[in-house]
Amino acid sequence: MIAIYPGSFDPITLGHLDIIERGSGLFEQIIVAVLCNPSKQPLFSVEKRLEQIRHCTQHLTNVTVDSFNGLTVDYAKQKQATVLLRGLRVLSDFEKELQMAHTNQTLWDGVETVFLATAKEYSFLSSSIVKEIAKFGGSVDHLVPPSILADICSSYPSP
């Protein structure tokens, strides 16, 4: 069974990596799918995010990394994936993700959404929080994979 783990991953966090690693034990293949959203101004280009995620997941033989435009369910059909993998941190995540899961099923009844509860040490963590801390010169080394720390630091010069 193939699962898609979609997101912006701008940047990938240890919370994302935790979901990828745990998901890799549940599914034959996981495709980490970076959404190209032209309406957002990302910190890192799609190409850079793909490179970062590939580096962070190179130890997982059943994980591939790709990018896509458009609807997630259309991408899932194209890749013959029947599962969308999502991480849940807090109750508000569940409400939003459940609504999206129902929407996706109205678009394609061949897809299921599987939710994994985020490990408690990452329950507060998001890419937005990482960027906010880094912007003001705070340490993010306990929030992101070590291999992307230099990328983040170079994006936010010291104040």
From Swiss-Prot:
GO terms for CC? cytoplasm
What pathway, per the record?
A: Cofactor biosynthesis; coenzyme A biosynthesis; CoA from (R)-pantothenate: step 4/5
UniProt GO BP: coenzyme A biosynthetic process
| Amino-acid positions noted as binding ATP in the UniProt annotation, renumbered to this chain | 8-9, 16, 87-89, 97, 122-128
Q: Where does substrate bind?
A: 8, 40, 72, 86
Look at the named UniProt entry and state the broad enzyme category this protein falls under.
transferase
Localization terms from the record = Cytoplasm
Q: Which E.C. number(s) belong to this protein? A: 2.7.7.3
* GO MF, one example: pantetheine-phosphate adenylyltransferase activity
Site (Transition state stabilizer) location in chain: 16
- Please provide an example of a Pfam family that matches this protein in its UniProt record: CTP_transf_like
Q: What is its main location?
A: cytoplasm
Taxonomy, superkingdom: Bacteria
Spell out the Gene3D superfamilies in the cross-references.
Answer: HUPs (3.40.50.620)
Q: Does the keyword Acetylation apply?
A: no
Reaction(s) the record says it catalyses: (R)-4'-phosphopantetheine + ATP + H(+) = 3'-dephospho-CoA + diphosphate
Entry-linked InterPro entries: Cyt_trans-like (IPR004821), PPAT (IPR001980), Rossmann-like_a/b/a_fold (IPR014729)
Q: Which UniProt keywords apply?
A: ATP-binding, Coenzyme A biosynthesis, Cytoplasm, Magnesium, Nucleotide-binding, Nucleotidyltransferase, Transferase
Q: Does the record bear Transmembrane in its keywords?
A: no
Q: Which cofactor does it need?
A: Mg(2+)
HAMAP family in the record? PPAT_bact (MF_00151)
| Biological role | Reversibly transfers an adenylyl group from ATP to 4'-phosphopantetheine, yielding dephospho-CoA (dPCoA) and pyrophosphate.
Name of this protein: Phosphopantetheine adenylyltransferase
| Upper classification of the organism | Bacteria, Bacillati, Cyanobacteriota, Cyanophyceae, Synechococcales
